[in-house]
Amino acid sequence: MSAAPSHIRPATRGDLPEVVDLLNACDIAEIGEPDTTADDVESDWAMEGFELAHDAWVAVGDDEGLVGYSYTGDQFRTGELEADLWMHPEHQEPDLATRLLSRAERRSRELAAERSYEAPMLDIFCIGVNRAKRELLLRHGYVLSRTVYRMTADLSDGVTALPAPEGIAIRPFRVGVDEHVMHDTMSEAFEDHFRQSEEPFDAWKARLLGHADFDPDLWFLAWDRDEAAGALIAYGHGDLGWVKGLGVRRPWRRRGLGGAMLASTFAALAARGRLLVELGVDAEGETQPLRTYERAGMHVTFTYELYAKPLAG
């Protein structure tokens, strides 16, 4: 692709197909296959408080095609903002990544000032194999703060049976009944998570239940009589299943409940012909979820690094 300086402008909804194509080109270069859908990008654009005209940018090459994309957001409202950037792997323009990063940092500082955060930070993920992005972030003052694993389970040979603890019943989510219970259970279960925030219920409901791949039979609640002990949210897309969140409330931890809920989800996905299941997990999580996922037959396929930078000053 051309090395001529690219024009950076605010993203529009009309850019969605090209943004998806760009991100999939990056996916292929990094992991060998496309891994981004329009729903994934639209989910970013639908985060609480996100304004597309101010919070996302595209870089347009001299052939009018998109060669870069970046965004910033503040969905957690904890003072830890997030951003990311992509460049087409065939596009050679040394300073484009820096220009895209600068847009995201500038907007993040504006958002932090508007919300009066005392010590705002900006977080950016980098897949372990992307050395150029890692070096870019390090040059601009970011430091490694966390490691996250992408894990995969192949269900072709069946689902590992992991029974629920005695007295616990795992049941599918009931639309119109369980929304508040699911929201509250997930919020409490993830209160120790390093990026935990209290997402307002209405925003949470619109984002997750409004997802194009929402299927209530892939969401589960674990019940101890009439009290929710844990929750799991999963989606299916094509032949792939994705576990978006699995949480167990503190009194019910260390009893195998997480694995049992995962097995229920695997069985539901396999029944729909989705034999490959993936999820992301914090490698340093206090609840040691990695062991739960390994017992359920999952293994690490990719490593992602989270880099952080103070926004003050």
Predicted regions and their residues:
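C-terminal "cap" of GNAT-fold acetyltransferases
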Residues: R150-A169, L275-T287, A296-G313
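A short, internal acetyl-CoA/4′-phosphopantetheine-binding micro-motif in the GNAT/acyltransferase core
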Residues: V60, G73, D84-L96, L246-R254, ...
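A conserved beta-strand-loop-helix scaffold within acyl/acetyltransferase catalytic domains
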Residues: E30-F50, S70-T78, H193-V248
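Acyl-donor-binding surface of acyltransferase catalytic domains
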Residues: G73-G167, E305-K309
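Conserved hydrophobic beta-strand within the GNAT/NAT acetyltransferase core sheet
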Residues: A83, L122-I124, V243, V277-V281
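Conserved active-site tyrosine of GNAT-family acetyltransferases
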Residues: K133, L137, Y293, M298
